[in-house]
Amino acid sequence: LMKHASGLFRFKENYIYVSEADMMRLHKVFTQEKPMNAYQLLQTALSGEYEGAPVRLTAEVKELINELTSDKEIALPEGLNAALRPYQQRGYSWMYRNSRIGFGSIIADDMGLGKTLQVIAILLKLKEENVINTRKEALVVVPTGLLTNWQEEIARFAPSITTHIHHGTARDLKRFDADVMLTTYGVCRSDSDLLKKHKWAVMVIDEAQNIKNHETAQTKAVKSIPAEIRIAMSGTPVENRLSEFWSIMDYTNKGYLGSIKNFNQEYAAPIQVFNDEQVVHKFRKIISPFMMRRMKSDKSIISDLPDKVEQNQYALLTKQQAALYEKTMLAAMEVIEGFGEETDSQKLFQRQGLILQMILALKQICNHP
């Protein structure tokens, strides 16, 4: 057909024009060795295209897509000691629907919009439905500084949920007897062999940018812990590059975006290097059911939030600090200026290193109590 059609061929009672590029794409589809997996089929359904060609969906697939993109409100758990704002209700309902279908969620609201409350509401709902029970509990992984905050927030908004902090040198998994275990990324890495033997109904990670580097031992440890439902919380799901988002999505919905190599080829490079708007549009479509992000600057989200007020407060250095600051700066500048206008790459690298060392030393002097 590719050799003889010359762009126009007869199909049933109609003539169809197909460009050479279209034919090459079709040939690639029909000659590929591996059939599409379930995630690739879902991406095709969500984007409405395959290899640039529009697709038609069956009634069953349309029903699944409608369920994924539904905005139907889910009843709040009875024991919740809080009234959710409309946008929080939407976030809670969205995470609940995803969890019941079998997908993970990335809640990426701006800081201050109540991500923790929305997730606590989910945990309570799942406990009331007996998804979280004495045989399968919930694991919440947070930075060390947030352990107590999480425990207090759960006690405040969902007092019927019992918690246990798994942290410190005396920690013992055998002593765990609660609905929710609270632990840290560091402990997750140290105790991953024990934690992944436990049956978890839900696993939540707060400040999910802690697993943005997919190659670190910490990220691998977190992802190795099995859970039926996964939720990631982050106000900054992408800080520098799209591979960070891939790593978080690989935690919530493993395999959905393919391997990191394929992801870089199909999405990261076209978006970051070539700013391909078509790829950006497709990428947004395929991730939208699994990530929700609302901004404080969006007045349609929260109209009664007051404008941010900044107040600058200046602290003076003590005489001892000021003298040490000046002495350190002069000594460092003398060494740095000794390099002159050197253009040798190695010398430039050394000079840059000395500048960074000086800045760090000056910051330490300013922070001295």
Language model segments and positions:
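Charged, low-complexity intrinsically disordered regions
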Residues: 1-63, 245
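ASCE P-loop NTPase motor core, strongest for the SF2 helicase catalytic module
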Residues: 54-275, 284-305, 309-311, 316-369
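Long, charge-dense, solvent-exposed interaction surfaces that engage phosphate-rich ligands
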Residues: 280
